[in-house]
């Protein structure tokens, strides 16, 4: 049989499925590494910027483009081909044979010949063959571009049967997950207008696949992303998200929208401000959908970090409770994104912080402060230190809920950088003015905690601890003005004077000045050498 004669799926008999399984495992490992890298930063002030930069540069990182391709395979094969069967123009048995066949790279020429024939069955066989070639571990994306396949795939998007449009879209989606030049070839060959047209298709799976290509293109580079913005595609995605109840389409639109935020420079606020409302609507519809929430929470985290105006919008939509509840989802990238949203709100005014407390955020922070992932613990400690720097009511709430004991446990067991944030929060608790609450933290052992912290080498935190110590001593003096200071007596009982003596000779001026002032105000000279 010549190569121009009919091909049958049985000729495509490689061990490709084993290769695809191996590729899925390789991609899973790479994704896991990307997630683990989240927890290896050393300085908290850098971690948010560093991690955000990593997220923003996904389009330039081929490893993460493979992750997008992985998502394509997992979701699309099982979900969309079933419903396409009702719209077929080719025999069902041929459709199934084509989709079940295996291919190998050595059949490249054979597949191209089949694709370019006029026979509809052979053409579909070749088209599926191209998609399967693209799904191989060593995907021949460039070779297919070099033989001119892209322009033919784009042509199929116009007025072709649904199964042809779907396969062509799928092929273009994988090509868009390649290098920047490969992705850009779709733009250069005029693919964008035809892809955008399919966003309006009445066939949901075509719409989903078109959305997917847009996400892969937007994540590639700011030039392609900005060309999509110019074509008002961001707004079109928002329109779809606002009008659909289909879960898969909501997931895909949210992911595609998130791609617009993952490339620097950040898009303008006046473009993206409507996204919050659409994401809020979707969060109500899919409150526990992990795939959707991963992208939705990333968008909200990014927006509250880079566009402070969106915090007000977020609060007005009243989805803070939904975001806080996501802290209970045991998925690292969802928890981190939600903690960043909470942290960005908590770093605002007192009313914003109070709203978080009213939505029971403290219940969740008690758990996330002891999460296995260091990054999550660090974010949680930072948020608590911000809340502890709030109003008297907010400090009292922390004390009422026994956060001194919670923070004390973290200080005792955690890494130094997390310990420092917790120390900051503990010291802030001493600024409470109500006698009832000062007595409570004294009873819970705050002097012991501060005593241990006075042995730290970090001058900044030493100064904070001395200030907190002064607050407690001032309370003791005020509570018994005519007699001995009960806090001084407790300090004496604990044997803290050796530490105080050493601090008199500290080389850092701010520590030296604060300790001298403390000793002069609250301790008799006889106690100090």
Predicted regions and their residues:
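Intrinsically disordered, low-complexity regulatory regions
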Residues: 1-119, 124, 128-132, 483-487, ...
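Buried hydrophobic core positions in alpha-solenoid tandem helical repeats
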Residues: 110-112, 152-154, 194-196, 236-238, ...
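Alpha-helical solenoid repeats of the armadillo/HEAT superfamily
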Residues: 118-131, 160-176, 202-219, 230, ...
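Elongated alpha-helical scaffolds that mediate protein-protein interactions in large eukaryotic proteins
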Residues: 97-104, 121-123, 133-148, 165-166, ...
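Tandem repeat domain/solenoid detector
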Residues: 180, 184, 188, 193, ...
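Generic detector of contiguous secondary-structure segments
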Residues: 113, 197, 222, 238-240, ...
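A detector of tandem-repeat and repeat-rich interaction/domain scaffolds
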Residues: 141, 145, 416-417, 460, ...
């Amino acid at each position: 049989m010549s190569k121009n004669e009919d091909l049958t799926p049985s000729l495509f008999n490689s061990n490709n499925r084993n290769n695809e399984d191996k590729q899925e495992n390789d991609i899973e490992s790479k994704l896991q590494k990307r997630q683990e890298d989240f927890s290896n930063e050393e300085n908290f002030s850098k971690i948010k910027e560093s991690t955000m930069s990593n997220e923003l540069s996904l389009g330039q990182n081929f490893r993460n483009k493979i992750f997008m391709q992985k998502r394509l395979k997992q979701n699309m094969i099982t979900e969309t081909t079933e419903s396409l069967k009702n719209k077929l123009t080719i025999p069902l048995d041929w459709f199934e044979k084509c989709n079940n066949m295996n291919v190998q790279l050595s059949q490249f020429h054979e597949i191209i010949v089949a694709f370019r024939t006029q026979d509809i069955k052979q053409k579909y066989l070749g088209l599926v063959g191209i998609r399967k070639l693209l799904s191989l571990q060593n995907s021949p994306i460039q070779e297919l571009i070099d033989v001119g396949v892209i322009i033919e795939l784009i042509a199929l998007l116009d007025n072709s049967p649904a199964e042809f449009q779907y396969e062509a879209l799928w092929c273009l989606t994988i090509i868009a997950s390649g290098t920047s030049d490969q992705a850009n070839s779709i733009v250069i060959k005029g693919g964008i207008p035809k892809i955008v047209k399919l966003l309006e298709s009445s066939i949901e799976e075509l719409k989903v696949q078109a959305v997917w290509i847009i996400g892969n293109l937007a994540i590639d580079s700011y030039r392609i992303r900005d060309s999509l913005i110019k074509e008002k595609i961001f707004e079109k995605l928002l329109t779809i998200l606002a009008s659909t109840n289909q879960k898969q389409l909501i997931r895909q639109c949210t992911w595609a929208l998130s791609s617009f935020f993952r490339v620097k420079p950040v898009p303008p606020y006046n473009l993206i401000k409507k996204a919050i409302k659409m994401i809020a609507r979707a969060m109500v519809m899919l409150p526990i959908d992990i795939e959707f929430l991963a992208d939705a929470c990333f968008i909200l985290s990014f927006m509250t970090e880079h566009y402070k105006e969106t915090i007000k919008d977020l609060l007005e939509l009243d989805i803070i409770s939904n975001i806080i509840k996501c802290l209970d989802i045991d998925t690292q990238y969802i928890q981190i994104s939600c903690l960043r949203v909470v942290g960005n709100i908590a770093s605002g005014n007192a009313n914003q912080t109070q709203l978080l407390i009213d939505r029971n955020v403290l219940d969740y922070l008690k758990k996330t402060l002891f999460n296995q992932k260091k990054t999550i613990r660090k974010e949680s400690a930072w948020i608590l230190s911000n809340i502890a720097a709030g109003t008297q009511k907010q400090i009292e709430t922390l004390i009422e809920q026994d956060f001194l004991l919670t923070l004390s446990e973290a200080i005792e067991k955690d890494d130094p950088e997390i310990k420092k944030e917790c120390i900051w929060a503990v010291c802030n608790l001493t600024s409470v003015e109500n006698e009832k609450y000062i007595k409570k933290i004294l009873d819970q052992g705050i002097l012991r905690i501060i005593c241990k912290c006075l042995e730290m080498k970090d001058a900044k935190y030493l100064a904070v601890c001395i200030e907190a110590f002064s607050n407690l001593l001032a309370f003791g003096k005020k509570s018994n003005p005519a007699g001995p200071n009960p806090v001084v007596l407790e300090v004496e009982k604990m044997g803290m004077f050796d530490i105080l003596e050493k601090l008199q000779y500290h080389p850092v001026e701010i520590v030296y000045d604060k300790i001298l002032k403390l000793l002069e105000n609250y301790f008799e000279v006889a106690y100090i050498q």
